[in-house]
Amino acid sequence: MSVPFDPASYDRQLEEKTARLRELLAPFDAPEPQVFDSPREHYRLRAEFRLWREDQKRYYAMFAPGDNKTPILLEGLPIASQRINALMPVLRERWEASPTLNHKLFQVDFLTTLAGDAMITMCYHRPLDDEWLAAAEQLAVELDVSLIGRSKGQKLIIGHDYVTEKLDVAGRTFSYRQPEGAFTQPNGTVNGKMLNWAFDALGERQDDLLELYCGNGNFTLPLATRVRKVLATEISKTSVNAALSNLDDNGVDNVTLVRLSAEELTEALNEVRPFRRLQGIDLKSYDFGSVFVDPPRAGMDPDTCELTRRFERILYISCNPETLAANIAQLYDTHRIERCALFDQFPYTHHMESGVLLVRR
């Protein structure tokens, strides 16, 4: 996939997104959204490239949506972080100089952080052997990165299979492990703005928080400092393990994390059936005043949406404003929008991240 890059059009496209969000939320008497912009370039902390062979050489390539046969060959990527742009030509030089690193290499993924960490994943159509491992270990030292080699049924790790990010929220620095292959917010600067907005919107509370779709604990860590205790759910095993590490690394000890889907937790809270993963957790001991949701693009299913209606405050981060509006429509008879925001996670595309605080009428 390629992303059009036109900094001169940035202000106009951000205003178009803001107008679109206003229009979607207008039926619900929403206040004017706070708008959080993005850096105009070098904002994307991860990038995935297929490699295209031409003139006996391999080039970084991306493809336009719907066309996987016409490569766009790249020397650099202006939307990607400066670290990725610095690594791209050096890595290419190294694989061109090394038959071991070059042979049947077909994809390269980069993951970086604002804190300066970097990881490269090199994917192959062949088994990786000791010769590859020796060359990769030398490469990782030269580039000062963690490096992962992947082939079918094989994953070799040099360094770590995660990067470490550090983000400041209300004067406190939180450290995050971001595992290879797991979801992370791609725009680190805007992610920091989202965390601070959510922290401020939740406010200081004397009750408990339910969090659905907690991922690696991106929002969990700062929000846990605002409440008595948190019950958080996540279905991805990789994300659950990362979240547990992040809670421990940051000394956050008032969070209970369960590996359940939002739909399963709804059944548990409605006492439809017991869940083995909830053994030892007394759901009745929680005094939930707020729920935080950050669902996938499909939004909340109707049952989960009904579950959130029980809460005085619903803090909702959305990557799809259309499904956000549909969920608000379901809740509007009992909750009103007190705050809303637009976060420009994805400049130069139609995608937008938004947030709303819904409060019971």
Curated annotation (Swiss-Prot):
The active site is at C319, E353. GO terms for cellular component: cytosol. It is an enzyme of class 2 (transferase). Its EC number is 2.1.1.-, 2.1.1.35. PROSITE patterns: SAM_MT_RNA_M5U, TRMA_1, TRMA_2. Keywords: Methyltransferase, S-adenosyl-L-methionine, Transferase, tRNA processing. Pfam families: tRNA_U5-meth_tr. S-adenosyl-L-methionine binds at Q185, Y213, N218, E234, D294. Transmembrane segments: none annotated. GO terms for molecular function: rRNA binding; tRNA (uracil(54)-C5)-methyltransferase activity, S-adenosyl methionine-dependent; tRNA binding. Dual-specificity methyltransferase that catalyzes the formation of 5-methyluridine at position 54 (m5U54) in all tRNAs, and that of position 341 (m5U341) in tmRNA (transfer-mRNA). NCBIfam families: trmA_only. This is tRNA/tmRNA (uracil-C(5))-methyltransferase. It comes from Pseudomonas syringae pv. tomato (strain ATCC BAA-871 / DC3000). The gene is trmA.
